[in-house]
């Protein structure tokens, strides 16, 4: 990776395609460097792991219920038949307030299924301010491609 990465080409590709698949060096550093460049360009950014994401669209944009771990305790007579359900706010709710562009970087995106990746692309097309970068694995140097191109192959 070059010593100085301006991120201009990355930002142009991100704005053109909306959802990118990234292969980053395993030693790290590329994601924070590019996120810093995006923040400098006016984006509001968030970095998350894709593990445990569930339904991406509901998790990111809608109020939804979660079931906390039971930790060996029984919940007889409390809550629903499926156990206690807690309501949580959408994870991108505070970022989508206002007019600023939003960039979401998902780590460990290789655990997501094809349909989940496709729903992330659809979410980017429905919400014009949202840009999603999914880290799909490691590589010796930083490279990226449109998510639609990855799903087509």
From Swiss-Prot:
Mode of membrane association: Peripheral membrane protein
Protein name as catalogued: NAD(P)H-quinone oxidoreductase subunit N
Protein source organism: Parasynechococcus marenigrum (strain WH8102)
HAMAP family per record: NDH1_NDH1N (MF_01353)
Gene that specifies this protein: ndhN
Location of this chain's protein in the cell: Cellular thylakoid membrane
Disulfide bonds: none
GO cellular component: plasma membrane-derived thylakoid membrane
Matches recorded under InterPro entries: NAD(P)H-quinone_OxRdtase_su_N
This enzyme's EC code(s): 7.1.1.-
Reaction it catalyzes: a plastoquinone + NADH + (n+1) H(+)(in) = a plastoquinol + NAD(+) + n H(+)(out); a plastoquinone + NADPH + (n+1) H(+)(in) = a plastoquinol + NADP(+) + n H(+)(out)
């Amino acid at each position: 990776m070059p010593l100085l990465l301006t991120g201009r080409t990355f930002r142009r590709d991100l704005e053109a395609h909306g959802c990118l698949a990234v292969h980053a060096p395993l030693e790290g550093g590329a994601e924070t460097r590019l996120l810093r460049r995006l923040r400098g360009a006016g984006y509001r950014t968030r970095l998350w792991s894709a593990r445990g994401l569930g339904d991406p669209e509901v998790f990111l944009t809608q109020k939804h219920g979660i079931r906390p771990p039971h930790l060996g305790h029984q919940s007889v007579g409390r809550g629903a038949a499926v156990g206690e359900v807690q309501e949580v706010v959408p994870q991108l709710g505070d970022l989508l307030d206002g007019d600023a562009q939003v960039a979401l970087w998902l780590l460990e995106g290789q655990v997501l299924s094809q349909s989940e990746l496709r729903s992330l692309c659809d979410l980017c097309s429905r919400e014009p301010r949202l840009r999603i970068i999914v880290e799909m694995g490691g590589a010796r140097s930083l490279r990226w491609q449109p998510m639609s191109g990855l799903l087509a192959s």
